[in-house]
UniProtKB/Swiss-Prot annotation:
Residues 1090-1289 are annotated as: WD repeat-like region. It catalyses: L-seryl-[protein] + ATP = O-phospho-L-seryl-[protein] + ADP + H(+); L-threonyl-[protein] + ATP = O-phospho-L-threonyl-[protein] + ADP + H(+). This is DDB1- and CUL4-associated factor 1. Disruption phenotype: Early embryonic lethality. Conditional knockout in mouse embryonic fibroblasts results in severely defective progression through S phase and subsequent apoptosis. Conditional knockout in B lineage-specific cells arrests B-cell development at the pro-B-to-pre-B cell transition: mice display modest reduction of D-J(H) rearrangement, while V(H)-DJ(H) and V(kappa)-J(kappa) rearrangements are severely impaired. D-J(H) coding joints show longer junctional nucleotide insertions and a higher mutation frequency in D and J segments than normal. Pathway: Protein modification; protein ubiquitination. A motif (DWD box 1) lies at residues 1241-1248. It is an enzyme of class 2 (transferase). Residues 1395-1482, 1489-1500 have a biased composition (Acidic residues). It comes from Mus musculus.
Length: 1506
């Protein structure tokens, strides 16, 4: 209570002093007493603030670091008084010439520096720095020292320091000499009379520092007792936890700089010295359960005796003492110590000896002075020369003598951190005696756990750098360093899924994130160092097993640093050659501490740190740690386990670990951050690219590794691999990796990301299930991967592109089973065709070959030889065009393994166009001896050419040209050696090459391969062929059934009498192509009495007399299909209706809305239109398909099944582990109501169990069943329900809603409007079908036609008789988001007339004119002045022009097949008769409805009329 009163008095007194200043400052009164009293108040509260033991490196405003502290309140009161602050700087410091006033002002300014923005004061106020330099050189005490201290604050700004280089050079030398003088005075005074220690005991000081209670043995003791402590008392756990009740160090100070995070200290003034004593005991690690760890003297000491070592004393600046003067001089020197140009001055004037004196608390007995000296020492340690000398002269040992806990110990952390940056100095440290280095590691571990937040930060970064020294690494492991390091993040409140640090301030959250970042960075360095050690062990074991020279490791005092590429190579080597159950001690410890899940949680949570500057670095460090650890199969299996993370709403959910990695790899959270994507991909590669079976001899190679049975090794590895393949596939890994294959941004890393993704796919493709799916995707079926292989994204990254091509070729080989020949575009269909060609038996008539030879001889003027050949071979005198009379020569089929038909640069395409005579090319000279027959397929092939007057004859030529010995020129006997060509290192190699020269080809092999090339060009090659003719080009017959229906509709109609029911095989398909490629608009439905129509969805009524339309206001409107009149209107929802589905009997109707409650409802449509049941949370509902006795509703990823009669919920189908999270999930029944497809997962309705999860390849469409019940269509993928194999991919269905006709033979695909504006604009830019719908043959998924309606489509529906199609079209501008949606009714199978096109063009022009009129108000005035007669004449002329143009214009609704269109145009004469017949058919169909509910729609109309 007394403390509170004192605080209130301080605040009131400062307010009174300011009021007194307001009265007196203009009257010439002496302001020195007021300023002096203010300084005393500030200094008193500074000492109170320091008693709370805040982080000494925390440079925030005290009121921000501790909102309850009085010092912060006093500083805010001062800074709010602008007049006083301006007078303090301008009048009392800059312009006043009165030394007492200057002194008082400088003292106050120095006191308020913790809350002052120094850059503003010293940069904006011209002349103040010059005054301070002048006083620091010439003024009397204490102004001289105050000025020096203020200059220290000014020089922290680098711009100011750079502007005053000369002044600083002079002043540094002056103050260093002053320090030397003051030091000598201290030594002299000590010799005269020993200064008593701040802590006096009856005998000797408690702190002879080598006997400090917390000595170098603390680390060993911590290792021994830590497990027992965790069991007995969590309050004393050796950990660093933010603001936690069981924190060993109670320093809870907030974050400061990005590299020096701090934590908040909640100070309670009520407890006074007793509370401070308790906190100090906590810092020392005291525990009532462990009294042996401390000395009795220290535990019995009061806080007043301990405080001088922990927080220091003498915060007052007056009277000036040598200790205060030295402290302020060191504050000035600290920011200047890092400048290279001042280093000679520091070295010359003995800064090292001075610092060695000041960091010795036995010499100074002033912890504040020692702390300032340590800060200055840290800045000097940045220089290599100084650091080397400091280490050589025992400086490290001096640092280790500083007691813990104390403010000076926190200063040691910065010195160690800066020392670690100097590799030469650290090597010298590592060469110290073992006990010294052990003390360094132990001291730093204590700092990491029990120091202030800045000390923890410095210690963590020290280890990050020093893990490259094996000596430090070994000691770190000996003292259980990994557990103590992991504790830093395991105890962070921001990783607590329950509250996520909700009670923390922004500064505390920032500090926690900094801790996570630094810890992950240290963990990455730790495991990289251990990875190199493990690699050495494996290599040495291999060398012992297989022989060879042992590689000696680098000395432990030498730093080992590795590039990212080297780390990747190490991981690949261990995965490839390590044992199946690799035992790795650090990984085992990490696994035991459950740190894999911890890192996954950190990655997941850090992805949402949008405002944290180092978010990307934190995630990348954590990913790199996991990448290294996944060389161990145990860790890989951890990624297949569930992890608790937060969803978008902040709720805890369970997800598979690998899905987090895949999400990061996809770029879901970090757009265009290539480093993060590469790190995530490396994890996936390590998990899926391990060897199928490992070298068995490695299973027992490491000392300390248990021996394993060799037979179990491949089995275990295969089990792990298979599980990882499965978990990556089930978490949509195929989709992620495929999307990364076509990545183009960031352009500098796209090629490398492609290569890594392709490498992961190669490993994943060893799974037969994955291989089957990939083989059906456009990547292979449409040769997309070959297109990607042609050019790199960035030409400068060709080396990465070469790797991508290598992996892509391997992927093709795995999926197709055939090796890829580089330079060819190979799809699976081509490879299968090449396989058939390779197995074909090639034969040709022998006499045709002899005829070709004879013709060639005649063309060369060798008539007699040709005559002899004709006579001996009994050849006809004229060239035969038919080969049936000749005996064929048979060539054996090529081996089955022939991958493809050979292609050469000037191949088929170039030779098809050439016209040459028969036999234009032949061997120049026959070989001296008949060569042996070469193997089949060893030569490239020529292609055919066409002779001018003869029948089509292939040109046969040798590709390999040979020099002729008789070329008509004199042969040169002597010739100098060529200076180019191949080079042989020795004659032996040359002889070896000569022995391997290929034999010259035979004529038979040339012709055989030439014919095989012809055969390969067939569209559908067959394995068994008749003899090939050399005179006519070969062509395999097209596969065609005997009863194939003709393409011409008239012929097909005539053949129905012979081949019912479609005129032959495929007649129905041809009919569908004819009918569903023609759509004629017949009417438009608009909302009556509305400026803009707002229809959102449509459906035909049960008897199809009415068109049911939902509006954006939630109304349901019924329009007569034939008259176009609105017959009824109902209010169903308060928001836009998105879905309508009437039951087949017409008695019920389902509706869904966007946001109003209920979201969906079931309505009765008998005599009264009323709501039967509501489905409050389901955004989409539909009837069961077969019996329509149930309703299935969709709420996000969850499917609900309801009973229609009672409205009760029967089933809920959802499994969070299987969720695909499609954005537009719509659950649906299969045609027999036994199965449900929800969120891409197939469910059994009877058992309510998930059967299969289909792979995800898109973000939006969840899929529908095909009416045949055998297939599932999910966006572009067609899946077989019997085998779950991927059957086809239909790229044209991408992002389209699929609607089947009543018979299930035709499906419509339309790109629907997006739900929100951002997606809407994105889809308009992305989709070529945003304003069109397409029709497909539902039996083979071949496209029939694309119908461009020139408007964005909201919905479409078809009637049961395939007569009409209703489409909701947006009449608004394509570039705007305004809605004017109408329903346009199309007649199916009718061709659009030219006058319809003209009318539509006129309508478009009128709409465009109206838009122009609305945009320009001035135009309306001009239009009023125009003559109406002239306007009418202009319109008539325009109509005539449009009619003439329309006759020759293109048909907007043209079918996809041009040939079919031409055939249809020929049959236009009979269209009138056909239309009459169609009308009769419609009437007949309309009268055949014999349903019991056939009069329901009539009842509705009658009731409405009543």
């Amino acid at each position: 209570m007394t403390t509170v009163v004192v605080h209130v008095d301080s605040k009131a007194e400062l307010t009174t002093l300011l009021e007194q200043w307001e009265k007196d400052h203009g009257s010439g009164q002496d302001m020195v007493p007021i300023l002096t009293r203010m300084s005393e108040l500030i200094e008193k509260e500074t000492e109170e603030y320091r008693k709370g033991d805040p982080d000494p490196f925390d440079d925030r405003h005290p009121g921000r670091a501790d909102p309850e502290c009085m010092l912060g309140h006093l500083l805010r009161i001062l800074f709010k008084n602008d007049d006083f602050m301006n007078a303090l700087v301008n009048a009392y410091v800059m312009t006043s010439r009165e030394p007492p006033l200057n002194t008082a002002a400088c003292r106050l300014l120095l006191d308020i520096m913790p809350g002052l923005e120094t850059a503003v004061v010293f940069q904006e106020k011209e002349g103040i720095v010059e005054n301070l330099f002048k006083w620091a050189r010439e003024a009397d005490q204490p102004l001289r020292t105050y000025s020096t201290g203020l200059l220290g604050g000014a020089m922290e700004n680098q711009d100011i320091a750079a502007n005053y280089r000369d002044e600083n050079s002079q002043l540094v030398a002056i103050v260093l000499r002053r320090l030397r003088e003051l030091q000598l005075q201290e030594v002299a005074l000590r010799q005269d009379s020993k200064r008593p220690s701040p802590r006096k005991l009856s005998s000797e000081p408690l702190l002879p520092l080598d006997e400090e209670a917390v000595d170098m043995d603390y680390g060993d003791m911590a290792v021994d007792v830590v497990d027992g402590e965790q069991e007995s008392s969590r309050d004393m756990e050796i950990s660093f936890r933010l603001d936690s009740s069981h924190k060993t160090s109670s320093r809870v100070n907030s974050a400061t700089k990005p590299e020096e995070g701090g934590l908040k200290k909640n100070k309670s003034a009520k407890h006074g010295d007793r509370e401070n004593f308790r906190k100090a005991k906590q810092k020392l690690g005291f525990s009532s359960s462990d009294p042996d760890r401390v000395f009795v003297e220290l535990s019995n000491s009061s806080w007043s005796e301990m405080s001088p070592w922990v927080i220091g004393t003498n915060y007052t600046l007056y009277p000036m003492t040598p200790a205060i003067e030295q402290r302020l001089i060191l504050q000035y020197l600290t920011p200047l110590g890092e400048y290279q140009e001042l280093l000679p001055i520091f070295m010359q004037l003995g800064s090292r000896e001075l610092m060695m004196f000041y960091i010795d608390l036995k010499q100074t007995n002033d912890v504040l002075l020692t702390f300032e000296a340590l800060k200055h020492l840290a800045s000097l340690l940045l220089h290599n020369k100084f650091a080397t000398e400091f280490v050589a002269h025992g400086g490290v040992q001096k640092l280790l003598e500083i007691p813990r806990p104390s403010m000076a110990a926190t200063g040691v952390s910065m010195c160690l951190y800066y020392l670690s940056y100097n590799q030469d100095a650290m090597e010298r440290v590592c060469m110290h005696p073992h006990n010294v280095l052990s003390d360094v590691v132990n001291y730093t571990l204590w700092l990491m756990e029990c120091s202030h937040a800045s000390g923890c930060c410095h210690a963590t970064m020290f280890f990050s750098i020093c893990f490259s020294f094996r000596a430090v690494l070994e000691l770190f492991d000996r003292y259980d360093g990994l557990r103590r390091l992991v504790n830093l993040i395991s105890t962070l409140e921001i990783l607590n899924l329950e509250d996520q640090g909700a009670l923390l301030s922004d500064d505390e959250i920032f500090a926690s994130r900094q801790t996570g970042k630094h810890t992950c960075m240290a963990l990455r360095k730790y495991f990289e160092a251990h990875l190199a050690i493990k690699l050495e062990q494996v290599k040495q074991s291999l060398q012992r097993t297989e022989g060879g020279i042992l590689v000696h490791p680098q000395p432990p005092y030498k730093a080992c640093s590795y590039t990212h590429e080297q780390i990747v190579e190490m991981m690949e080597f261990l995965i490839e050659y390590g044992p199946a159950q690799l035992y790795w001690e650090p990984a085992e410890v990490f696994l035991k501490l459950s740190c894999v899940q911890l890192l996954l949680q950190l990655i997941s949570i850090a992805c949402n740190w949008k405002t944290y500057y180092a978010r990307n670095d934190t995630v990348r460090f954590a990913l790199d740690v996991l990448a290294i650890l996944t060389v161990v199969p145990k860790i890989q299996l951890q990624l297949a386990e569930s992890v608790d993370v937060l969803d978008e709403a902040g709720s805890a959910v369970s997800t598979v670990g690998i899905s987090i990695i895949l999400g990061v790899a996809e770029g879901e959270f970090f757009i265009h951050d290539a480093e993060i994507q590469k790190s995530a991909l490396q994890i996936i590669i390590n998990c899926v690219c391990g060897p199928d079976n490992r070298i068995s001899s490695i299973g027992k190679f490491i000392s300390g590794t248990p021996r394993r049975k060799l037979s179990q090794t491949p089995k275990s590895s295969e089990h792990t691999l298979a599980k990882m393949w499965n978990v990556v596939q089930s978490n949509n890994g195929i989709k992620v990796l495929l999307s990364l294959l076509s990545i183009k941004m960031p352009i500098t890393d796209a090629d490398q990301i492609r290569a890594l993704a392709c490498k992961a796919l190669v490993g994943l493709s060893r799974s037969s299930t994955v291989r089957q799916i990939i083989s059906k995707l456009p990547l292979f079926s449409s040769c997309q991967i070959q297109q990607l292989m042609k050019e790199p994204v960035l030409q400068d990254k060709r080396s990465d592109h070469v790797k991508f091509c290598k992996y892509a070729a391997e992927l093709i080989e795995r999926v197709s089973g055939k090796p890829l020949l580089i330079g060819t575009d190979v799809s699976l269909a081509r490879l299968q065709k090449a396989d058939v060609v390779a197995q074909s038996r090639i034969s040709f008539p022998e006499k045709e070959l002899l005829l070709l030879i004879r013709n060639h001889l005649i063309s060369k003027g060798l008539g007699e030889t040709a005559t002899v050949l004709t006579r001996e071979a009994d050849l006809p005198m004229t060239a035969a065009s038919h080969s049936s009379a000749f005996t064929p020569v048979t060539a054996a089929a090529s081996p089955v393994s022939l991958p493809r038909t050979p292609r050469i640069a000037n191949g088929i395409a170039s030779r098809l166009g050439s016209h040459a005579t028969v036999g234009a090319s032949a061997p120049s000279a026959p070989p001296a001896h008949p060569p042996p027959r070469p193997p089949q397929g060893s030569l490239p092939l020529p292609g055919p050419s066409y002779a001018g007057n003869s029948p089509l004859i292939g040109r046969i030529s040798f590709i390999r040209e040979r020099p002729s010995p008789c070329n008509g020129r004199k042969i040169r006997v002597l010739r100098q050696k060529s200076d180019h060509g191949a080079y042989s290192q020795s004659p032996a190699i040359k002889k070896q090459l000569d022995r391997h020269l290929p034999s010259p080809p035979t004529l038979d092999s040339i012709i055989t391969e030439y014919l095989r090339e012809q055969h390969a060009r067939c569209k559908n090659p067959v394995a068994t062929c008749p003899p090939f003719s050399l005179f006519t080009p070969h062509q395999c017959p097209e596969p065609k059934q005997r009863r194939q229906a003709p393409i011409n509709f008239t012929s097909r109609l005539n053949r129905r009498a012979s081949f019912p029911k479609y005129g032959g095989v495929d007649g129905g398909c041809f009919d569908r192509h004819l009918i569903f490629s023609r759509f004629r608009p017949i009417s438009v439905f608009r909302e009556a009495n509305e400026d803009e129509s707002g229809f959102t969805c449509c459906a035909f009524s049960a008897r199809e007399r009415f068109l049911m339309l939902g509006t954006c206001t939630g109304q349901l409107k019924l329009y007569n299909v034939f008259s176009g009149q609105e017959e009824a209107s109902y209010n169903c929802h308060n928001s836009a209706i998105t879905h309508l589905e009437p039951s087949r009997d017409g008695s019920l109707l389902l509706t869904s809305a966007t946001w109003s409650q209920p979201l969906s409802a079931l309505w009765g449509m008998k005599s009264v239109f009323d709501m039967k049941h509501s489905f409050t949370e389901d955004h989409y509902v539909e009837f069961s398909k077969h019996s329509q006795d149930r309703v299935i509703g969709t709420k996000g990823d969850i499917a609900h099944i309801y009973d229609i009669q009672t409205g009760n919920k029967l089933l809920t189908l959802f499994n969070p582990d299987l969720a695909n999270n499609y954005k537009r999930n719509c659950a649906t029944f299969n045609p027999t109501d036994d199965l449900v497809l929800n969120d891409g997962v197939l469910w059994d309705v009877r058992s309510a169990q998930a059967i299969h999860k289909f792979d995800k390849f898109n973000m939006n469409i969840s899929g529908v069943f095909h009416p045949n019940g055998l297939e599932v269509i999910i966006n572009t993928e067609i899946w077989d329900l019997r085998t779950f194999h991927l059957l086809h991919t239909v790229p044209a269905l991408d992002q389209c809603r699929v609607v089947f006709n009543h018979t299930g033979t035709v499906m419509y695909g339309a790109m629907l409007q997006a739900d929100d504006e951002d997606d809407l604009l994105e889809e308009r830019m992305k989709s070529p079908f945003g304003s069109s719908f397409r029709t497909f043959n539902a039996t083979d998924y071949k496209p029939i036609a694309t119908i461009d309606v020139k408007r964005n489509i909201f919905d479409l529906c078809t009637d049961t008789k395939d007569c009409y199609l209703a489409v909701i079209e947006n009449q608004g501008s394509m570039d705007a988001l305004n809605m004017d949606t109408v329903c346009r009714l199309y007649e199916v199978g009718r061709q659009r007339l030219a006058e319809d096109e003209d009318e539509e063009e006129d309508q478009e022009e009128e709409e465009q004119e109206e838009e122009d009129d609305d945009e320009d108000d001035d135009d309306t005035d001009d239009l009023d002045e125009l003559d109406t007669d002239q306007l009418l004449e202009a319109e008539l002329e325009e109509d005539d022009n449009n009619e003439n143009a329309g006759e020759d214009g293109d048909n907007d609704f043209s079918p996809s097949d041009e040939e079919l269109a031409n055939l249809l145009e020929e049959g236009e004469e009979g269209e009138d008769e056909d239309s009459d017949a169609d009308e009769e058919v419609e009437l007949i169909l309309g009268d055949t409805d014999s349903s019991d509910n056939s009069d329901l729609e009539d009842d509705i109309i009658l009731s409405l009329n009543e």
